[in-house]
Amino acid sequence: MIYIREGYTITDLHCGVTCSSNNKTVHAGFNKTFESIKSQLAILLDQLGNRPVHCVGHSLGGAIANLAAVWIRSNYKIPVKLYTFGSPRVGFNAYAMQTETSLHGIYRAVHRSDPVPMVPVWPFVHAGKEYRLSTCVSLTGASHMMDGKRLGNYTYFLKFHGNRLSISGAVRHCSFRKAMM
């Protein structure tokens, strides 16, 4: 399992577009962040061999996990599943469609009142089926946090939607810091 945690800097607001590793249009800021950790991922993946990979991320980490999953599948030809929680939209429709066809499962969990999955706006779109975790309708920053009882909602999602993570070997964590612009 590769877990990419959230992180926030002013460069997260950079919403230009660029081409991803699969030559589709994606958010430039997310792609720049992914590019900054790609060499670390390559070292890790070279050690794992041909074992399946689960890419997991929350918030911005979900966007980076999305880009990582596509890159891993394209370059390592191993089964990859993607699990995101409260992730923003990553790319245009062509990117989302290619992501859906190349990965071995996309599980995109959102809290109904979390504003992060609503950005960036069109023409960015999500890949994969959405799993809503609450019936709340108010927009609050607290809806986006993965702490306390809200974390329980995410755990419920993994346990009861048939997405148990069976992992052999060590669980690896990859965190990142974006380079300043």
Each model region followed by its residue ranges:
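Non-catalytic, mobile gating and regulatory segments of ester bond hydrolases
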Residues: 1-56, 60-181
